[in-house]
Amino acid sequence: MSDPFFDTNVVIDWLNRRPEARAELIRYRRHRISRIVWTEVLAGEALEHREAIRQVISAFDVVEIDARIATAAADIRYRSRMKLMDAYILATAQVNGSILITRNTKDFPAEMPGIRVPYTL
């Protein structure tokens, strides 16, 4: 399994200096996020803070949505009724042979294959 992808809540926790998120990120050499996560992080910030946040999250490799990811997201959405944006986030990790690290057990059940929930708040 290659280096993981991080869900929006873990990235936001890291930006907010939560020690649990920091500890999780230090475990891995490479930090990847879906373009959807990148968008969700920026969407949660006031316009005047976005450039600073964009620079900080540039430490993450951002993986763009392509046809394989879109097809996998459609399959996940159909099978699980997961919200479409969450399906895109999970599909990005799966198509790239990785796990998704999240603390969002509401939308990503911890027992679902390919999900790692290292902490909850």
Residue map of PLM features:
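Short, well-structured N-terminal submotif of metal-dependent ribonuclease cores
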Residues: M1-I33, L42-S58
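Alpha-helix capping/helix-boundary segments
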Residues: V10-V11, V37, I69, Y88-I89, ...
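Acidic, PIN/NYN-like endoribonuclease modules and their adjacent C-terminal/linker elements
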Residues: R18, L90-L121
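Short active-site oxyanion
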Residues: Y28-R30, A59-D61, Q94-I99
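A general structural signal for well-ordered alpha-helical segments in protein cores
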Residues: S34, W38, R50-I53, D66, ...
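Acidic catalytic patch
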Residues: A59-R79
